[in-house]
Amino acid sequence: MKLRSAALDLLAGKHASLLAFDCEFWHKGQAFLPREVGGYHLTRTGDAWTRSAPFFVVLPPPAGQLNRVSSKFSTTTPATAEVLDILEETERSAPEFLGDRDIVDVYFADSKVKPYLKPTSWLKGFAKLIGESVVVVKGDMDLKAIKSACAAHGFTFKTPLGIVDIAAHNPEFTKRCKTAKLEGTYDCIKKELDAGLKKAFPIGKAHDPVSDAAMAIQIAAWLVQKDVK
C-alpha cells in the first residue's frame, strides 16, 4: 500500500524506514521477553511511503517458562480465551487440578496463534530491521524485551536510528483524556486523527499487537502535527 503523509515524513526525518510495533510478553522471573510481536514496516521512496502488510508472529517461551498466559494480553479465539481464563484461575487457586492442561499448549493450539508460530531465529532479522529504522512504540518495554531476547540467544541488537515513544506525552494525555492508556488516548483524540492514516492502519481490539501498533503510529503522527501542550 502506497501513501503520502507529511506526518510520516516528520516522524522519519531523513531516514527511509519506519517501524511501528508492539509486543505481548512471556514473563520469566522479573524478565519480560517477547511472546507476540506485531506491527507495520514502512519504506520511503521519493515522496511516497510503501506500507507493508501487517506482520504478526508468536515466539516460543524461554526455558523454565511458568504456564501462565493471560487471555487479556493474547490474540486468540474467544473459546481459547475462555479456557485460558479457567486454567489461569485454576493455576492460581488449585494447581493440583491442572493435570495435563498446560496453558502454553492450549495457547499454541489456538487457530489464531498456531499459523504464526516462528522459531526464535526470527528475532535475528527483526533486530536487524530495528537497527535500520526509526521505531514508533508506546513505552520502552517492547525494545527492552527484544534486546533481552537477542542477548539471551546471541543475536546482534543495534539501537534504532530513532525512537518515537508516544509514552513521553503521557502527562499531556492524562490531562486531556483523563487516561494515558493507549486505547483510551486513541478514543479521546480519534476525531482529530488523519483520515488517510486511519484507513492505512485499521484498528482492532486492544492488546492485539498489530492494532496497538496502528494506534501508536496514528497518535505519533498526530503529535508531530499538533501542539498538545
Positions of the model-derived regions?
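Substrate-recognition/cap helix-loop segment adjacent to the acidic, metal-dependent catalytic center
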Residues: 141-164
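Active-site-proximal helix-loop-helix substrate-binding element of RNase H-like nuclease domains
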Residues: 68-105, 166-214
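Long, highly charged low-complexity segments
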Residues: 3-12, 23
